[in-house]
Amino acid sequence: MRAAIVMRNEKTNIMDIKNIKQRWNATILDILKAFIDVCKRHDLTFYCCAGTAIGAVRHHGIIPWDDDIDVIMPRPDYDRLLEISKSEDWGKYELVTPYDRDDYPLYFSKISDRTTTLVEERERPCVIGLFVDIFPLDATDDDLDEAKRLKDRYTKVINRLNAVSTHNTFAEYISLLADPKEWGRFAIKTAAYFFRSPIRRRLLAQMDAISHLYDYDKAKNVQVYTGSYGYRETFPKAWLGRGKMFKFEDIEVPLPEEYDKYLRHFFGDYMQLPPVEQRIEKHHRAYLNMDRRESIEEIRKHSDIKI
């Protein structure tokens, strides 16, 4: 019988998963396979991106010190995926989106394993399972300066959404109130405490308006507004093409057709291994159960964790 794996961190959102890395990787790879199956059945386009793309080219699989899988999806396909998920049963998998759950603090979607439990941040407690990140890829302005301005506008909305989604302690509220420079944040968080759901809907509508400003099919440039690489998230749509397949563990996955231009744009010499001290897992994990789904109420009953 396989030993149960339940891990928790009482003070921070950092959790070492080295001892369970093999099982972790196998689980997220299975999630990717399920996602690929959905895309094949509905003729949806996606590309592996970021560290996952480097992993495919340099390691032919998950980077040994990486701990997630990321894909980008053209906006028309992404919007179709959101609709498909509402009417289709994916068995042990589910699509988690910011439109369906007020407790979900992010602004892109994840395909998640219902048979596992993961809380990434105690400040923004949301129960999901192990996952693959799905980032929408939006058309943007042909002029790169205007594309930057749009990125800045979008980021401001993201920052407001982050503020609304973060749960502060009473002491933290008092600290904000005591500092006149923080009164603006105090006002936002107080309003969010009472009106979180309508404020979230309004912010998401603002983000969607920016995302749909341009016709994807006619666009010269595309942009991952929800990505974490700043202005590098804008690049020529022509780089994507029909995709180029690479071995990734025991499957093949698509990368942008001009994958070398794409990866050098983001990472420079991506074939060069980073220094040893930078080969670390970077994602948040406050609570993890690899064996079953728990509710937030169940997790809070554990005496040694406060979420």
Task: Annotate each predicted stretch with a short phrase.
Residues 151-155:
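Short, His- and charge-rich active-site/binding loops that engage polyanionic ligands
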Residues 3-6, 10:
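Acidic, Ala/Val/Gly-enriched low-complexity intrinsically disordered segments
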Residues 12, 16-40, 82-142, 160-268, ...:
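Conserved catalytic core of two-metal-ion nucleotidyltransferases
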